Structure formats: structure tokens, C-alpha cells
């Protein structure tokens, strides 16, 4: 399943700030959603008993008809199967995305140049789910009509994220102010530490941002908006040099 996405950048980009979505089909295929489960294993070495023969050569100790449990205590394994681990990870990701749990791990700050941005208050490992890009999900045709309406008002910034999923074009419109922090993450093509993915949860698709690498506490979160059209670059050169 191929997914492509871009976040629209326009000349009316909001003054206080300054995507190709990675392929993903559903939660089952999400790439290392988070470090949600681990397991440990223990193993023992079994040394077979030696056959003993008397000097007369007539006595042989034969253990072939005995149960191994007579000699070794059976220990219950605490190891989980790979399916159990995968199911637990998927369930944890589902809850985290739907409940917006990670919002509390991020903070809004103001930069003198870019305006508002988002920093992390905790460390993230490569592949961890960080935050969802939340807004109003709509089909491409509807989004283009709304985009045209926005273009008539220079006071409205661009928070529309266009992407393709299952061979169909969609858009998430996060223009309206909200408490969701994903909409305030700034752009960087030179040093992004996040990437976008589309996952399906309970029949609905969600655009999420995951760590491209280890991210340290206090770092600003950044991802590549992905818009490379000539018109957009001409109006917003910072898209290719930040």
C-alpha cells in the first residue's frame, strides 16, 4: 500500500511559524509504534546421564523409559509469543492515539524567528509514536473548495495536510485553533526528527508523527512538509533551506 502526503505551504503561511507520509497500511504494519512490550528468556543446559557398566559387564543403567520430569523440574515459561507482543503494541498505540495521551509530553514555545513551535519534555526512541496531526478529515475535492476560501483571507494561515491513502486523496484541515500540538510542529528539510505515517484504527485512518531517530528531552520537533512545487518554493523559499 503506497501512501504519499504533503502539507500545503502558501504565501499566506502564518507569521508565527517558519508531507510526504511514509507508506503504511494499518496499525498491523506500523513501524515500531513504541517500546511497549519486552520479554526475557531463560534456558538451561541438560547433561545426559552416563550409562554405567559393572566390571562384570552385565549391568547397564537405562533411563530411556523414564520421563524427563523425573530428573528436571518443569518450569513455566514467562516468554510471550511474537503475536502477543505485537497485539499488545497495537492495542497500546490505539489507546495512545485515540486518547491523545502524548499531548502532555510536549510543550508549546515561542521562537523569535519562527513563532510558535513544539518541544518535547521527554526522550523518544527511533520509531516511537510522538503525536497525531489532528484536524478535520475530508476528501480531496471538498478540501480544495475550502482551500480556495482560505486563500481569500490573508489572515488565515495554512494548516491543510494533503495525502494519499489506499489510492485515494485526503486532507486533514487543522486550520482552526485547537489544543492539539501536532498542528504547530515546524518544518525542516535539513534536520527533521519526525516523519509522517498513516495508520488505520477501528476503520478510520489517522496521520501520525513518529521519531526518525532518537530525540532528546528539550529538542524542537520538526518534520518535512513535503511540498516541492515550483510555485510554492518561489513563495516560500524557506521550505528548502531550513
UniProtKB/Swiss-Prot annotation:
Protein role: Histone methyltransferase that specifically monomethylates 'Lys-20' of histone H4 (H4K20me1). H4K20me1 is enriched on hermaphrodite X chromosomes and during mitosis. Involved in dosage compensation by repression of X-linked gene expression in hermaphrodites. Plays a role in growth and body fat regulation downstream of the TOR complex 2 pathway.
Pfam families in alphabetical order: SET
Biased composition (Low complexity): 30-43
Enzyme class: transferase
EC number: 2.1.1.361
Residue numbers spanned by region Disordered: 1-61
Entries under CDD domains matching the protein: SET_SETD8
Binding site for S-adenosyl-L-methionine: 114-116, 159, 186-187
Subcellular location as annotated: Nucleus; Chromosome
An annotated Gene Ontology molecular function: histone H4K20 methyltransferase activity
Keyword S-adenosyl-L-methionine part of the UniProt annotation: yes
Classification via PANTHER family: N-LYSINE METHYLTRANSFERASE KMT5A
Annotated GO CC locations: nucleus; polytene chromosome; Set1C/COMPASS complex
Protein name: Histone-lysine N-methyltransferase set-1
Major localisation: nucleus
Keywords for this protein: Chromatin regulator, Chromosome, Methyltransferase, Nucleus, S-adenosyl-L-methionine, Transcription, Transcription regulation, Transferase
Similarity section: Belongs to the class V-like SAM-binding methyltransferase superfamily. Histone-lysine methyltransferase family. PR/SET subfamily.
Tissue specificity note: In embryos, it is expressed ubiquitously. In late embryos, it is expressed in hypodermal seam cells. In L3 and L4 larvae and thereafter, it is expressed in vulval precursor cells. In adult males, it is also expressed in 6 unidentified posterior cells.
Amino acid at each position: 500500500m503506497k501512501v504519499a502526503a504533503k502539507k500545503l505551504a502558501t504565501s499566506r503561511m502564518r507569521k508565527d511559524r517558519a508531507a510526504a507520509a511514509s507508506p503504511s497500511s494499518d496499525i498491523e504494519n506500523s513501524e515500531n509504534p513504541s517500546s511497549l512490550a519486552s520479554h526475557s528468556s531463560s534456558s538451561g543446559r541438560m547433561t545426559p546421564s552416563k550409562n554405567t557398566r559393572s566390571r562384570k559387564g552385565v549391568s547397564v543403567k537405562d533411563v530411556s523409559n523414564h520421563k524427563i520430569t523425573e530428573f528436571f523440574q518443569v518450569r513455566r515459561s514467562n516468554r510471550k509469543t511474537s503475536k502477543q507482543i505485537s497485539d499488545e503494541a497495537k492495542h497500546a498505540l490505539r489507546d495512545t492515539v485515540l486518547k491523545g495521551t502524548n499531548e502532555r509530553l510536549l510543550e508549546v514555545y515561542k521562537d523569535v524567528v519562527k513563532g510558535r513551535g513544539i518541544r518535547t519534555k521527554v526522550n523518544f526512541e527511533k520509531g516511537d509514536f510522538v503525536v497525531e496531526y489532528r484536524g478535520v478529515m475530508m476528501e480531496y475535492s471538498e478540501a480544495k473548495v475550502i482551500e480556495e476560501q482560505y486563500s481569500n483571507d490573508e489572515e488565515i494561515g495554512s494548516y491543510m495536510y494533503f495525502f494519499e491513502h489506499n489510492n485515494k486523496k485526503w486532507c486533514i484541515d487543522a486550520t482552526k485553533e485547537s489544543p492539539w500540538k501536532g498542528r504547530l510542529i515546524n518544518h525542516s528539510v535539513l534536520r527533521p526528527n519526525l516523519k509522517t505515517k498513516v495508520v488505520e484504527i477501528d476503520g478510520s485512518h489517522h496521520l501520525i508523527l513518529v521519531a526518525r531517530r532518537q530525540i532528546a528531552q528539550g529538542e524542537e520537533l520538526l518534520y518535512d512538509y513535503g511540498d516541492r512545487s515550483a510555485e510554492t518554493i518561489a513563495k516560500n523559499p524557506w521550505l528548502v533551506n531550513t
